[in-house]
Amino acid sequence: MPDLTGQLNRTSSYATSFGGLSDIWRCIWHKNGSNTQVAVKSIRSQALDEKDVKKKNRRLLRELKVWSRLRHDNIVPLYGTVSGFGQFVSLVCPWYDNGSLSGYLESHSETLSIIRRFQLLSDVSAGLQYLHSCSVVHGDLTGSNVLISSDGRAHLSDFGLSVIAVEFVGMSYFTSALNGTVRWIAPELLAIPEEEGATAIPTPNSDIYSFGCILFQVLTGKPPYYEFKRDAQVVVAISLGTQPSRPELPVIFDHHWSFIKDCWSIKDRRPSSQQVDEYIKSQLYFLQHDTSSPD
């Protein structure tokens, strides 16, 4: 995996955006005489001694090596790593001008047709199935970790990083959920572990729950649990077994709502990523060939 240290220039003195556990920098990569816009993601952490930093960097690089080998149209490519943006090595990926799925839906929700929405969902389901076929669990599938390219395609990013970030910062999923991802996290990951110090580990089943939340978000233009303004309220709702409520508007067709509920069922009864991808693509095919459906 290439070390791009010394090949990047920051476009500003400060990070462009801040995630729950990381910072994003917009940079220019000087490559073979041309300039390419890239995003540099650095994992935030508390102060560590040099020995601990080296140990965690080795762990991070092992995980990133898996990402660097992945090749799929709906997976954000990892160009390499870079030092100098924090205590740990940082990731270098393409810069997506259309930003995240959440931001894209906020900006375009009024104009997106049902076909266009299912095209986005088809991209997400295809990327997720590919990850699972490579024995990779995403672990943090949210509207912020799906990026939209200039041609309007959706690409999955940051898979596997949530577990590392939680380890590095030394917190549980329950605590990290309050950093803005709780609306997409499977309930079993928020359960208080029986053993002290143990932490819940994401699985393909928990990814499917999160996909159900993405499906909800794309069809409605609203995040799951939109009726609650604060994430702490969402945590309480999940602890009580309350699932996101079905909005009156926009209308979600019964068969789509039924499939969302399947994704939110108890973990052993959720569909596989292959079944999810087949369902989404069958719905897209039907919409594209239904003469009564709006474009």
Regions found by a protein language model. Name each.
Residues D207:
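Conserved catalytic-loop aspartate of Hanks-type protein kinases
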Residues S149-R183:
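Activation segment/activation loop of eukaryotic-type protein kinase catalytic domains
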Residues D23-L48:
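Glycine-rich ATP phosphate-binding loop
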Residues H132-S149:
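Catalytic-loop of the protein kinase fold
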Residues P77-V89:
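Short beta-strand micro-motifs within the conserved protein kinase catalytic domain, predominantly
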Residues L120-L121:
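Activation segment signature within eukaryotic-like protein kinase domains
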